[in-house]
Amino acid sequence: MTAPDQVARPDGVSAGLPRRDLRQVVATLSAAQITSWGVLYYAFTVLQGPISADTGWSHVAIAAAFSGAQVVNGATGIWVGRHIDDYGPRRVMTIFGLLAVAALGVVATAESFWVFAAGWLLAGAAMAGSLYPPAFAALTHWGGPDRVRALTTLTLVGGLASTVFAPLTTSLDQAMGWRSTYLLLAAVLLLAVTPLHWWGLAKPWTPSARHRQPDPALDVQDGPVPEPDADAPAWDPWTVTRSRPFVLLAFGTSLLTLATYALVVNLIPALVDAGLSPGVAAVALGLGGVGQVAGRLGYARFAAATTPTGRLVMVGTATAAATVALAVAPPVAAVVIGLSVLLGLARGVYTLIQATAVTDRWGTHAYGRLSGVLTAPSLVAGAAAPFVGAALAAVLGGWTGAFLALAGLAAVGTLVVACSSPTRPSARAARSSARS
């Protein structure tokens, strides 16, 4: 059902909400995302050490539980995307937000490691309905022609989650311990985020049609888009997920994600091992976050001047080159900080490239389904990233070899995504073929 002021196209694709309503949705999701990311993700980076010190569980085991959550996140996200396509984000984000509250309750009260790990697996399922992918699906559907601006705003605010919640979590842990901290953060989710999802997302939703013709306004060939034939066959989203371009895009972006986050997670220990002080290493990582914000601020202009595959190749190339430079650069603060900012810039752009990868190639139809499948391998890669980075350093004799190997992964990922552009014959070519 659609409201009178929301245009619904005959093919089941929403033309977007009125701008006032869209601004309300962006504000709702921005507040929910900064809180959900802070509680479900960044709080763990602060509390991992205190948890190990209090319980005696090893850092590796605790990190493995958290990585397991990311794997469950990726697997559950496929179902979440399909549900959002059909019913909208309100119900699923509210229910999964409540699941997050319950999961953190299990984590906070666990007396055995296996109960703790089970709590994180539940939290991983909750992440699938609470973090960026469902929010991206909502704004892609409701944003209409303003969706890139809406997505940019969301990621700018969401990017502040670590800035807000890392020091907050540290203070809470020092005052009351990690268990009470998680219980308090769970209460924040319950009292703040759940109402935002339930009341702030109560907007009309046009269910995605199961099958329809490709969108004639779609940039599927990294260039001018031909009109499809009027009698062109309809397509199914799952046909797209089995296509060569989709598979290559999923594989290539998972390699880029693995390289990017293995570098970020291990940046501070690598810089300290190279001879820099922990303070300088922390500044380098923090200013990389500034670069990330700058990349997101400039994304709309960058996207307007590039093609979908072209910008992904540029970001992948920049990531690989900066990683090589970081591997061989002398441990000079100014040099390291400059490279960290460049890598942050690439990460900021990459987040929005991931958010728009489906719409840039296949349109807004079935965005939730396609995005859920596309991002699942990247989520698994991100979960493995900390272990992959550390393992490479151990096998290759240090962080220089590890960073060069990660640069190689980024380069391979870039080559793969360069071959991922979808194509289809133009209507003119089809008509010429028919006449001949």
Task: Cite the ranges covered by each PLM segment.
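C-terminal transmembrane helical hairpin of 12-TM major facilitator-type secondary transporters
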Residues: 288, 292, 306-357
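Helix-to-loop junctions at the C-terminal end of transmembrane segments
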Residues: 76-88, 295-307, 393
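Intracellular juxtamembrane helix-capping segments at the cytosolic ends
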Residues: 129-143, 349-362
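A late C-terminal transmembrane helix in Major Facilitator Superfamily
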Residues: 361-396
